[in-house]
A protein has these predicted regions:
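Extracytoplasmic/secreted cell-surface and envelope-processing proteins
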Residues: 37-43, 63-67, 136
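Hydrophobic faces of well-ordered beta-strands that scaffold small-molecule active sites
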Residues: 1-4, 29-31, 53-57, 127-130
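Surface-exposed amphipathic alpha-helices with a cationic face
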Residues: 22, 40-50
C-alpha cells in the first residue's frame, strides 16, 4: 500500500491532486479538510480516482480557521502554562501551537463531536488523529 498526506487548501485543485496520486500509484490519502462539506467533496473526487480517504483530524491543536472561531467563542478552552499564560495569547515554541486543554470536559465533548461528524461522512474509511498530546 502506498499512501500520502494532503491538506485541502484553497489554492489546491483537488481534482489535479488526486489525478497525480492515481498516476503515481497511490492507494490512499490521509486528508485534512476544513469542514465536513470539504471532506464530502474531496471523497467524491478521490473515489473517481480509486483513492481511499482517511480523515487526518487535528485534535488539540486546531487548524487556523477553526482555532480562530474557538478563540472568539471559547478563549478559556486553551491550555495554560505554569505561569498562567494561555496558548491562545502566548507563543509555545512556534506561533502555530495554540493547544486546547484536554482536561476540560467541554473540549473533550467538542472533539468527540468533531470526530463523530467526520465519521458520519460516507466514503471516509478511517481516521488519523494528530496533535493528540499536550503542548511542548
Amino acid at each position: 500500500m502506498f499512501w500520502t498526506w494532503l491538506e485541502d487548501l484553497p489554492d489546491i485543485d483537488m481534482e489535479t491532486a488526486f489525478t497525480h496520486m492515481e498516476e503515481a500509484g497511490l492507494d490512499g490519502v490521509m486528508l485534512h479538510a476544513a469542514s465536513p462539506e470539504d471532506y464530502r467533496k474531496d471523497v467524491e473526487i478521490a473515489r473517481r480516482h480509486g483513492i481511499t480517504v482517511y480523515a487526518w483530524v487535528w485534535t488539540l491543536n486546531p487548524p487556523r480557521q477553526e482555532r480562530q472561531q474557538i478563540m472568539e467563542e471559547h478563549p478559556d478552552w486553551f491550555s495554560v502554562n505554569r505561569n498562567g499564560q494561555s496558548t491562545a495569547e502566548y507563543k509555545a515554541y512556534v506561533n502555530s501551537y495554540k493547544f486546547l486543554c484536554p482536561a476540560l470536559p467541554e473540549v473533550r465533548d467538542y472533539l468527540v463531536q468533531k470526530v463523530k461528524d467526520i465519521c458520519a461522512i460516507e466514503g471516509v474509511e478511517g481516521i488519523c488523529l494528530d496533535y493528540c498530546r499536550l503542548v511542548d
